[in-house]
Amino acid sequence: MRVLGIDTSNYTTSAAIADESGFRQNRKILSVGKGECGLRQSNALFLHTVNLPEIMRALSPMEKIDAVAYSAYTREVEGSYMPCVIAGKAVAESTAAVLGVPVYRFSHQAGHLMAAVKTCGNEEIGKGEFLAFHASGGTTEMLHAAPDETIGFTADIVGRTLDISVGQLVDRVGVMLGLTFPCGGELEKMAMRSTLKKPPMKLSLKEGNCNLSGAENAAQKMLARGDDPCDIARFAILFAAKNILAMSEAARETYPDLPIVYAGGVMRNAIIKDILAKSLPNVWFADTELSSDNAVGTAYLGLERHKREVEK
């Protein structure tokens, strides 16, 4: 049984094929102009439309496809939507129609969770309740998650950012320092050259929710007074890490026995992962390659759903 998955996010055009033996994927990061912190939805939609034929062609030969799955919305809540998913929808629905196979719709967030569940190294995660932290360019959420036969996972927010996301903090500071968006990888390299021990500002956590925009302002002040850019980079990453840790600790107070799995592009960062792994027990991370936007999780969601449908 083989499923084609498609995900068209704010940052990446992705397609993948998953079956019981593993997966193949191809993806392309959307081009962003120098000094810019992301794309307009209309521009992202255009780039997905340009990228998808190339992305799909690179997966050939696909052999027999039994079902198609795609990211149809951001989160599993009413009104959750972003225009750039239209490109993925068009290709997925058309492909399924031509092949005469079922098409399954999931949330972009569920795809992230499934990619993490499949690659974190703990086969028990995803079989019952667990905590999941989704940290990306558009999301900073601590979730109480559980498997669901139809939508992949239920995910209730138990902590979130009240302003910008950790990914936005990282990218805005990176662009401030002259890096090209998305900035996570290059900012991490700069931070590795710094000896800064802790972020020079206090966290602002309330009922498990965080505020991050103050760190962007602090980084601007550090730059204005001539601080080492590497120290500014490390400050931003440490501040993000400390907030993720504090939100994780708050969730653990309510759910002390549940594992935490971390997903999303920000979780590619080795500094952040090291802090979390050394500070908390029973924490798990998506494979580095599948932390950022991908269609692998979406393909696996479709595979699991299709197996259940066939068995009915």
Tell where the protein language model's regions lie, with residue ranges:
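A short helix-loop
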Residues: T8-S9, R24-N26, E124-G128, F133-S136, ...
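Glycine-rich beta-strand-to-loop/alpha-helix junction loops that act as flexible
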Residues: Y70-Y73, S136, V261-N269
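Glycine-rich phosphate-binding/hydrolytic loop that grips phosphoryl groups
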Residues: H112-A116, A286-K312
